[in-house]
Regions:
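General helical secondary-structure elements
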Residues: 6-9, 23, 35, 61
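Generic detector of short alpha-helix boundary/capping microenvironments
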Residues: 13, 45-47, 71
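A short, charged, amphipathic alpha-helix used as a generic interaction element across diverse proteins
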Residues: 51-70
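Negatively charged, low-complexity tracts enriched in Asp/Glu with abundant Ser/Thr
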Residues: 1-16
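Short aromatic-glycine-(Arg/Gly/Cys) micro-motifs in beta-strand/loop hairpins
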Residues: 20-49, 65
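Short acidic DE-rich linear segments
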Residues: 75-82
Length: 82
């Protein structure tokens, strides 16, 4: 797979769910390394970015976003089975 980037951020982590991905981007500049997590559709449509200064905080944000989405998916499935 080709290296993915968005607005100068290299995508370094991808968590794919059935209809959406959450990604972690990294960008190194003269002032240091910056991180962002995005929601992503179709490997190219990045939105709802959370911009973060620290790698560990960015990883936590990524996994919290994934967790929130999984909880939402589960609630939708439970509603369908009622």
């Amino acid at each position: 797979m080709n290296e993915r980037t968005n607005v100068g951020y290299k995508i370094i982590k991808v968590v794919a769910l059935p209809h959406v991905e959450f990604v972690l981007g990294e960008k190194t500049t003269d002032s240091g390394t910056k991180y962002v997590t995005w929601r992503c559709n179709n490997h190219t449509d990045y939105y709802y970015g959370h911009y973060i200064e620290n790698f560990d905080a960015a990883m936590l944000d990524l996994y919290e976003r994934v967790q929130d989405e999984v909880i939402f998916i589960i609630s939708q499935l439970k509603e369908k089975t009622k």
